[in-house]
């Protein structure tokens, strides 16, 4: 027997709330929107109308998946980042509010450069950081690099979603290998790499370790493998005077900052997030002093 959208909403909200889900009201709405194909505005407009049996069945199926621990973002297939919608899937991490600071700081640094600019989003995942920068800065071109085919498919879809096909591209690449000369150089390199120590993965929340990709989480024994590799190998991809910005995990900021110091970066900064946690570490490639081109050295050694 069918029920109204309002009755179905109340039923789902009560089930989620009883399971201890804090944002039960928001998530019940998201589930109904996903099941019905309606926007939030359309759902409010039609809230007193009757649903179809198919919509009710789909909504209750999504509810059960949520009760089993699956993140709401994966259930609905998209999530908001810096006020922009992005397609998501279990192939990439869900965009998080903490990471919005990385995008904002990247835009701040790009404003220091004259004319058209280029941003490289390494370990791009959904592409949310690089594409947010490109969407909000009309003179910026973005290159999104990831090793995961599933993540690259999300990048492709999100480029199209935000009508950025003329200013953004996605490429398959390994952050722990030297960059290709074909990439050219960038004004800003942003990266939210895997940074969870391997030994801590088992202790992650079930909604994370059970659904989000391990390759996007595992940062090696101390969580710093990607910071070491990228800091040394990807220097040639930055223009002199260009900025490298990392998101970091709790307690990692000083160690990552020291990696940048040892690599010759200047103007090292650590920025805290809204929770008071050191979240972004950045450094600037010197404008005059040449940093050793480790890519050339690597190629010469191989030759």
Which ranges hold each PLM region?
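Conserved SAM/SAH cofactor-binding pocket of Class I
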Residues: 100-203
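Non-catalytic accessory regions of SAM-dependent methyltransferases
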Residues: 1-44, 48-51
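Conserved AdoMet
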Residues: 32-109
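Conserved hydrophobic residues forming the short capping helix/wall of the S-adenosyl-L-methionine
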Residues: 16, 110, 159, 234, ...
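Helix-to-beta-strand junctions that scaffold the AdoMet/dcAdoMet cofactor pocket
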Residues: 164, 212, 238-240
């Amino acid at each position: 027997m069918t029920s109204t959208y309002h009755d179905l909403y109340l039923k789902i909200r009560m089930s989620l709330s009883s399971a201890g889900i804090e944002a039960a009201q928001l998530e019940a709405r998201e589930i109904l929107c996903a099941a019905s194909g309606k926007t939030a505005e359309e759902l409010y407009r039609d809230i007193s109308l009757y649903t179809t049996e198919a919509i009710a069945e789909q909504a209750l199926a999504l509810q059960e998946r949520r009760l089993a621990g699956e993140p709401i973002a994966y259930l609905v297939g998209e999530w908001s980042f810096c006020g922009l919608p992005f397609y998501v899937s279990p192939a990439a991490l869900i965009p998080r509010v903490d990471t919005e600071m990385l995008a904002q700081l990247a835009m701040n640094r790009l404003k220091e450069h004259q004319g058209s600019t280029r941003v490289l989003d390494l370990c791009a995942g959904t592409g949310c950081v690089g594409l947010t920068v490109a969407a909000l800065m009309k003179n910026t071109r973005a290159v999104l690099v990831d090793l995961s085919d599933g993540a690259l498919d999300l990048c492709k879809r999100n480029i199209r979603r935000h009508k950025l096909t003329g200013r953004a591209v996605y490429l398959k690449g390994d952050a722990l290998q030297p960059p290709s000369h074909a990439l050219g150089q960038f004004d800003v390199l942003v990266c939210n790499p895997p940074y969870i120590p391997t030994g801590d993965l088992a202790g992650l929340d079930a909604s994370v370790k059970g659904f989000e990709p391990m390759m996007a989480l595992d940062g090696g024994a101390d969580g710093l493998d990607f910071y070491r590799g990228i800091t040394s190998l990807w220097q040639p991809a930055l223009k002199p005077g260009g900025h490298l910005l990392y998101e970091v995990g709790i307690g990692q900021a000083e160690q990552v900052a020291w990696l940048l110091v040892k690599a010759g970066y200047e103007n090292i900064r650590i920025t805290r997030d809204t929770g008071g946690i050191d979240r972004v570490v950045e450094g600037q490639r010197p404008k005059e002093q040449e940093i050793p081109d480790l890519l050339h050295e690597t190629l010469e050694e191989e030759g």
